[in-house]
Amino acid sequence: MKTLVIMEHDGAALRSGSGAAVGFAREVSEDIAVLVLGDNLNAMTTEASKFAPVLAADHPALAAPVADRLAHVIVEVARAQNIELIVATATTWAKDIVGRTAGLLGGAMASDVIGHELIDGELRLRCPMFAGAANATVV
C-alpha cells in the first residue's frame, strides 16, 4: 500500500507528531514517502529526509497554512504518486487539511485512531465513538 505522510511543521522545524505519523505508516506499509508543504522548506525537508523519501511543495503561496490550498496540492501529489493511504498527525491543522483532501479524492477520513490491524492486506482502524463510550473498527 503506497503511503504518503503529511509532515507538520512550524516554519522552522517539524512538529514531534510527524515522527509518530511516520512510525504508523511504517507499520502498515513498506512504500512510504513524506510530503512537506509551505515556503522556504530547506530546514524541514532536510529533517524530514531522516524519516523517508521527501516530496516537497515549496512555494510562497503555501506559506500560510490555508486548508483549501494545501488540500489541493496534496490531492495532486496523491494522484501523481498513486497514493493509497494518506497519514497525518492528530492535530486540528491535520484534521482540517486531511478532511478536505479526503473529500476532494472521494474518500473517507478516520481520525483519532487508537489502534490498527493489517489483515490480508486490509487496514482496519479502531476509533472511539460516542465520546469514548465505545470503539468502532473502520475498514
Report residues per predicted region:
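N-terminal glycine-rich FAD/FM-binding segment characteristic of electron-transfer flavoproteins
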Residues: 1-139
